[in-house]
Amino acid sequence: MDRKTYLCGRDKNEAVSTPHEYTIEQILAAEIHALQNIPHENDYEGAIGLILERVHEGGGRLITSGMGKAGQIAHNIATTFSSTGTPAYFLHPSEAQHGDLGMVCSSDVMLLISNSGKTREVLELVALTRRMYPTLPFILITGNPDSPLSGEVNVCLSTGNPKEVCPLGLTPTTSTTVMTVLGDLLVVSEMQRIGFTYHDYSLRHHGGYLGDKSRELQTEQR
């Protein structure tokens, strides 16, 4: 079938030219390659320890933030942290400028996600937060460890800046895959640090398959 006829708003006779085309095997290989090349030298322990100190020892919360696709990853990371024993929420950088910054407390820690490391709204969020709480710490996940944002944070976790597996080289694809995995790394490591159990899990999952499964596993463990 001629793919030209399937794009909304385009004349079906309009010529199509994409800079590059990937096979399914190449797409999968590119995603795997990106994961295999996540920098091992990142200060993972620093990030994990900072969350432990601020949230579990200091009574604060983990705040995640980002714009666009990175923001969606940040939102997912926040909900996963919350469901596994680390109180967290997502703060939209733009909404923060219209009152939502009031949700931030001095004991919190903020996890920012920006592939470029120079997202305007995220840079503004850092500046505005520091006006309220000058010592509040920041963690950054980015593809650009030499960026303006990198110079503003306490811990910087590099994605390795993988090439996007997109015909145009623009759409966040491999970069968001790595961001998600780095979020998983932080979540799982924090669960292990705090000794999160089946019982703890069941208290936070009252319904659905996972709730039933956690209670079943808790019973088996007794």
Segments predicted by a language model, with ranges:
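Histidine (H) residue identity feature
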Residues: 20, 33, 56, 75, ...
